[in-house]
Amino acid sequence: MLRFTEDHEWLRLEGDVATVGITRHAAEQLGDLVFVDLPKVGTTLSKGAAAAVVESVKAASDVYAPLDGEVTEANDAVVAAPETVNQDPEGAGWLYRMRLADPSSLDALMDEAAYAALPK
C-alpha cells in the first residue's frame, strides 16, 4: 500500500518499516538527477524535517521526512546512479527506509486517489 505526502514523497509500509522515495511527478519536475544525498542509518527523523537532498541540472530539492522515525537503510545504489530515481522513482529509485515511531500515523497521509486529485 502506497501513501503520499503533499510534498510529493511516497511511502510503502512493510511491518513497521516504511520505504520512502519521491513520486514520479517530483522526479519529472526536477529533471535528470545528478546527485543524491541520503540520511545516515540510525538518524532520527521528525515529520517535515529535511531528510535527503536530490539535485538535478535544474535545481536542488530537499526530501522531507513524511513521518517520525529512525533510518534503518539508505539506498546506496541511487547515490552511485542518481538517474535510477528518474527511471523508477516508485521502485528501484527508493531513497531510504525508516522504522516508524508510530505506524498508525500512516493513516494521516494520502492514498493514491487523494494524491492523484492533488493539484500539481
UniProtKB/Swiss-Prot annotation:
Q: Give the cofactor note text.
A: Binds 1 lipoyl cofactor covalently.
Instruction: Locate the N6-lipoyllysine modifications and list their residues.
Output: K58
Q: Which domain of life is it from?
A: Bacteria
Keyword check for Ligase = no
Q: Where is the Lipoyl-binding domain?
A: 17-99
Q: Name one GO biological process term.
A: glycine decarboxylation via glycine cleavage system
Q: Does the keyword Transcription apply?
A: no
Enumerate the cofactors the protein uses: (R)-lipoate
> A Pfam family name for this chain?
GCV_H
**Which Gene Ontology cellular component annotation is one that this UniProt entry carries?**
glycine cleavage complex
Listed Gene3D superfamilies = 2.40.50.100
Known CDD domains for this protein?
GCS_H
Which InterPro entries does this UniProt record tie to the protein?
Answer: 2-oxoA_DH_lipoyl-BS, Biotin_lipoyl, GCV_H, GCV_H/Fam206, GCV_H_sub, Single_hybrid_motif
Q: Which keywords appear in this protein's UniProt record, sorted alphabetically? A: Lipoyl
Q: Read off the NCBIfam families from this record.
A: gcvH, PRK01202.1
Q: What does this protein do?
A: The glycine cleavage system catalyzes the degradation of glycine. The H protein shuttles the methylamine group of glycine from the P protein to the T protein.
Give the family, as the similarity comment puts it.
Belongs to the GcvH family.
- Fill in the subunit field for this protein: The glycine cleavage system is composed of four proteins: P, T, L and H.
Concerning PANTHER family, the annotation shows: GLYCINE CLEAVAGE SYSTEM H PROTEIN, GLYCINE CLEAVAGE SYSTEM H PROTEIN-RELATED
**What's the name of the protein?**
Glycine cleavage system H protein
